[in-house]
Amino acid sequence: MSAEIKFFDQVNAHFDRAAAFLDHPKGLLEQIKTCNSVYHMAFPIEKDDGTIEVIHAWRAEHSQHKLPTKGGIRYDHRVNEDEVMALSALMTYKCAMVEVPFGGAKGGIRIDRRNFSEAELERITRRYTYELFRKGFIGPAVDVPAPDYGTGPKEMSWIADTYLALAQTDVNALGCVTGKPVAQGGVRGRKEATGRGVYFGIREACASAADMKKLGLAAGLAGKTAVVQGLGNVGYYAARFLADAGVKLVGLAEREGSIANPAIIGEGANGPVTAEASDRLYRRGVMVIPDMYLNAGGVTVSYFEWLKNLSHVRFGRMEKRLEERTNRSLLEVVQKLTGKGLSEAEIRAYSTGPEEEDLVNSGLEETMVTSYEKIRAARSRFREEPDLRTAAFIVAIEMICGTYGDMGIFP
């Protein structure tokens, strides 16, 4: 029987492979890899039939080199301490790589949500929030959860409401969690953010003529085919945006069955490929666009939501009307110079200022584009080019080391 593959060990194997390209003190690298805090809690909840069930849950804060820490909460019967530690580490490196100023965290509750009523799920969520609050593992300046596998805006609204009741004097209390409904301080565009980020990332990878030539492909998305495994929130929106860009979807796999494509792989999930498998794929010439870059859309837009909560102003409110007036003035000048008239409907269409969702999507696109440029630049620095995952880890490690250096704690 083969030994169990520990998720956290796999993340550290990726880290070590990247660290070998760099010249940083061993102690500093060990500090970056270490999971700073893990809280395992067990609490009872009363089920609808009056019976009591003990619930096990975790919250891991991998790195406090930036505060608050940030990471989702998943509800799944397979949740365990190793998993939340690994996922919190990936969040640390993901945030550093895309320059979102958070440390990494992750949480999970070990339940199969199909076995619980909505009322029971609400009681579990609120009690979990209380336990986090009691131990100082939640707050807009401390640790900010978000949705993950098995959770969504409804669970985040329960968390926010519970925190508001516990921290009544915190004016920034809504910033304690992201992925909330828009009516409760959420941001437009958050639901589809991770899938949209996957699309932006794949688009950037396919835009490189040199990289595509190595795979025997032309640059660009048009005419390419894709198979999407899993049609949850991420898979659905990634498939939709890819299809809109001219990609032909030739397979959509769910738990009932799956189809594999041996040439193009983009990791929308967290840690779907082991370190050994990643190395084998690279040696076979398969391009793997790594998870810590490709699914960073969620945390990027969560960052925008957090900023909105702290500023107490929705995006676009300050500048929308000014931009509309400026654009209208420019259009009027162009009409005079060209002698071509536009209808009022055309003027409105061309001059309308950005809405909140427009600004959020623009910020997400900018993040994904510039982050991929940094990954390609890091890869090209070395005589033996590392794969994209290793290059992404290199970018993240150097960002974190720079933070410690700025703090004067480490050389």
Regions found by a protein language model. Give the residues of each.
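Short, Gly/Pro- and small/polar-rich lid/capping loops
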Residues: S2-A42
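Adenosine-phosphate binding glycine-rich loop
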Residues: S2-K6, A205-C206, N261-P411
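NAD(P)-binding Rossmann-fold cofactor-contacting core
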Residues: A245-I259
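Glycine-rich, N-terminal phosphate-binding loop and its surrounding beta-alpha-beta segment
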Residues: M41-R113
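Hydrophobic Val/Ile/Leu positions in short beta-strands of Rossmann-like dinucleotide-binding domains
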Residues: A226-V228
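Glycine/serine-rich phosphate-binding loop and adjoining beta1-alpha1 elements at the start
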Residues: D76, C95-A222, D406-M407
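Glycine-rich Rossmann-fold phosphate-binding loop(s) that bind the pyrophosphate
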Residues: G230-G232
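N-terminal Rossmann-fold NAD(P) dinucleotide-binding loop
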Residues: G235-Y236
